[in-house]
Amino acid sequence: MKVKVIPVLEDNYMYLVIEERTREAVAVDVAVPKRLLEIVGRERVSLTTVLTTHHHWDHARGNAELARLLPGLVVLGADERICALTRRLAHGEELRFGAIHVRCLLTPGHTLGHMSYFLWEEECPDPPAVFSGTGCPVPTCPTSPCPIPLSLTHPTPQGMHCPWPAAAHAWRAQFSRCTRAWWRPWAPCPLRQ
């Protein structure tokens, strides 16, 4: 599994996840479809599916144009407000793209229909990936080398609106303690089971 991180807008990202054996690709949070298609062409992959974390424009505005340019493209997400949605996903649902497994995790907080995606390949030495959209208030979370307990990265809606900067320091301290204690490279990943 190869993940291409694509910076877009001023402070956002899209992702292209490539199944290296079949050259099938899945995009996550399409905001700028032309930029994504440039990379799809450069990587020589077949883009078949879009996973959308939530309906906000900076994560979903490119879905309609991409679906128009790629007939048959499947657009997935948990919220019916997502542009060009083909099928709604349920919490705990699992998908497969070649050797890549996807576990869909409803993570409301930023929006009610926010969904995160946990991706992994069996018998692959590469670490799994979590795509949390805007559900992760901890700046280091998306690039963490390990799966992170969702209770830390997806607080309640009330917790998302806590005062700063004191709350930010508390979250960082809690995240740091938990990550050091929780992650062990030799331990099985609880989200894969």
Swiss-Prot record:
Belongs to the metallo-beta-lactamase superfamily. Glyoxalase II family. The gene is HAGHL. Pfam families: Lactamase_B. One of its GO terms (molecular function) is hydroxyacylglutathione hydrolase activity. Binds 2 Zn(2+) ions per subunit. Its cofactor is Zn(2+). Keywords: Hydrolase, Metal-binding, Zinc. It comes from Bos taurus (Bovine). This is Hydroxyacylglutathione hydrolase-like protein. Its EC number is 3.1.2.-. Zn(2+) 2 binds at D58, H59. Hydrolase acting on ester bonds. Zn(2+) 1 binds at H54, H56, H110.
